[in-house]
C-alpha cells in the first residue's frame, strides 16, 4: 500500500493516466494538499492531481503543467497573460492594482486585455474629473494633454506635456485604422479614442 507518496496510475493502453497522492495512513488525498512548501489540488471525486488552469470553489487556479504545484502572479497560458492572486492563487479579473500601476483583465476569461483596451479602461476611471488649464493630476484636475500624459504613463508610455508635442510623437494612421487607446489629435487639442467612433 502506498503511504505518504505520489503515485502515477496508468488508466489507458497508451500509458496515460493520473497522478495521485496518498497520506501517511495510505488514504488517497482529495482536495487541497500542502507538501514541501507548495500547494497542490486533487480532484475531490477521482483524486487526480490538478494540472494547468483548473476551476474549483468558484474560481480558476493554475497548477504547473509538469509538477502540479500551484502558481501565483503573472502566468502565460496558451499565449495569453493572466494574473493569479499572490496569496490565494485565485485568478483575478477586472481591474488590478500592483507595483504602483493598474492592469485590466477580461471579466469572463481572465486574460489580460490588449494595451489599447487597458488604456481606455484606465482613462474611464477619471470621468468627471474637473477640467483645469495646465492640470496634470486627478487631484487638481486635467487639461487635455495633461490627461493623456497621465493615463499613458500608467502603461510606461512617456508623452510630452502639450498637445502639439504629443501630435509629433508616435505614428499617424488613417482614420479607418484607428484603434481604442489611440491618441486623436486636432487643432489645439488631444483626446483618447475609445471605440465606436468616439
Regions found by a protein language model. Give the residues of each.
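N-terminal capping segments
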Residues: 113-145, 149-162, 186-189
Amino acid at each position: 500500500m502506498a503511504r505518504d507518496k505520489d503515485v502515477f496510475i496508468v488508466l489507458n493502453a497508451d500509458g496515460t493516466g493520473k497522478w495521485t497522492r496518498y497520506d501517511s495512513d495510505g488514504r488517497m488525498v482529495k482536495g487541497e494538499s500542502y507538501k514541501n512548501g507548495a500547494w497542490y489540488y486533487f480532484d475531490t471525486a477521482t483524486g487526480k492531481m490538478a494540472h494547468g488552469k483548473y476551476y474549483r470553489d468558484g474560481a480558476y487556479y493554475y497548477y504547473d503543467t509538469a509538477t502540479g504545484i500551484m502558481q501565483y502572479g503573472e502566468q502565460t497560458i496558451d499565449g495569453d497573460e493572466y494574473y493569479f492572486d499572490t496569496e490565494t492563487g485565485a485568478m483575478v479579473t477586472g481591474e488590478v492594482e500592483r507595483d504602483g500601476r493598474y492592469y485590466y483583465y477580461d471579466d469572463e476569461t481572465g486574460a489580460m486585455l490588449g494595451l489599447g483596451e487597458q488604456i481606455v479602461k484606465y482613462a474611464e476611471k477619471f470621468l468627471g474629473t474637473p477640467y483645469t488649464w495646465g492640470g496634470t493630476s486627478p487631484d487638481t484636475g486635467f487639461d487635455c494633454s495633461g490627461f493623456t500624459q497621465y493615463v499613458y504613463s500608467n502603461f510606461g508610455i512617456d508623452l510630452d506635456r502639450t498637445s502639439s508635442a504629443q501630435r509629433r510623437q508616435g505614428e499617424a494612421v488613417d482614420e479607418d485604422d484607428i484603434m481604442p487607446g489611440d491618441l486623436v489629435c486636432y487643432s489645439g487639442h488631444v483626446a483618447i479614442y475609445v471605440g465606436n467612433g468616439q
